[in-house]
């Protein structure tokens, strides 16, 4: 029985959310996990030159500082993403800054990129034999003068230890960060990052893919702009989406007005609509990772049907337990058996039109 099951969700929920998260990290470090991984070639996906053991990843935010890189693979994930990591250490926003909306199975956070900084994180990754694909989610310091410089220097800093990079310009908790999604700024940023990657490719002799992570709160016109810039750039894929500022449909009255980004069950519909719209705009070749509101096999599969090559989750694990990825994979294999499907890739795009026709609410 796992450390988490021994403690129990109800007991963890009695703790402050950040204390509970710290306890989860400590539990993973202790190695008290007994999950049987699901290994099946039908779940494998290859994108951007990387072969993923399965299509479910752990989203950024859980292992911010690369403390449990290998341990999370014992929870069944096919890949993990650490961070967000900034150039300099950052304490983040004042506490309390993390809130559970239990009625909605949601989380509001205004963490503010709290992390140990890239020097310490690099030290944890360098020379470390990893059990799977590890992405590094990079961001800008809150007080930085030149945000673009923070990204391009982090590309250089982490290049030899990253399997892929995620450029996070969509967190709502760093002032001015989402402004980088505006087309002129986005164009400058993506060009600068592409140039930095090309320089590192020449220096190291190998290629590291780059993904752009966007917000779910963009307008149709802004999504068009992102799509056009993606087509013009040599970025390898898109991650849809980060947390939302919307509070539409929440049942929780007390905490709904807390500032910060909302994740969990209520984000599923909005993020899936944006995912499908971006698949339509980008075409079939550019890779997309779907994130937001995944809590079971049906929601994970729906992301794939809406156009995702891979999916990520985090908040769902808070409510459903640490074995969520394994549970999903087992049920997906049952779906595939029932549907006569030989690969998870066969489901991709089956419901793009259905989701893309939905209007984005304000």
UniProtKB/Swiss-Prot annotation:
Details of cofactor binding: Binds 1 FMN per subunit.
UniProt entry keywords in alphabetical sequence: Cell membrane, Flavoprotein, FMN, Membrane, Oxidoreductase, Pyrimidine biosynthesis
Residues holding FMN: 60-64, 84, 137, 168, 213, 241, 264, 293, 314-315
GO biological process, one term: 'de novo' pyrimidine nucleobase biosynthetic process
Reaction equation(s) it catalyzes: (S)-dihydroorotate + a quinone = orotate + a quinol
Superkingdom, natural source: Bacteria
Cofactor: FMN
EC number: 1.3.5.2
Listed GO MF terms: dihydroorotate dehydrogenase (quinone) activity
Listed CDD domains: DHOD_2_like
Compartments, as annotated in UniProt: Cell membrane
Catalytic center residues: 171
Annotated binding of substrate, by residue: 64, 109-113, 168, 173, 242-243
Pathway membership: Pyrimidine metabolism; UMP biosynthesis via de novo pathway; orotate from (S)-dihydroorotate (quinone route): step 1/1
GO cellular component: cytoplasm; plasma membrane
InterPro entries assigned to the protein according to its UniProt record, in alphabetical order: Aldolase_TIM, DHO_dehydrogenase, Dihydroorotate_DH_2, Dihydroorotate_DH_cat, Dihydroorotate_DH_CS
Membrane topology: Peripheral membrane protein
Main location: membrane
Function (record text): Catalyzes the conversion of dihydroorotate to orotate with quinone as electron acceptor.
Family: Belongs to the dihydroorotate dehydrogenase family. Type 2 subfamily.
Name of the protein this chain belongs to: Dihydroorotate dehydrogenase (quinone)
Originating organism: Bartonella henselae (strain ATCC 49882 / DSM 28221 / CCUG 30454 / Houston 1)
Gene that encodes the chain: pyrD
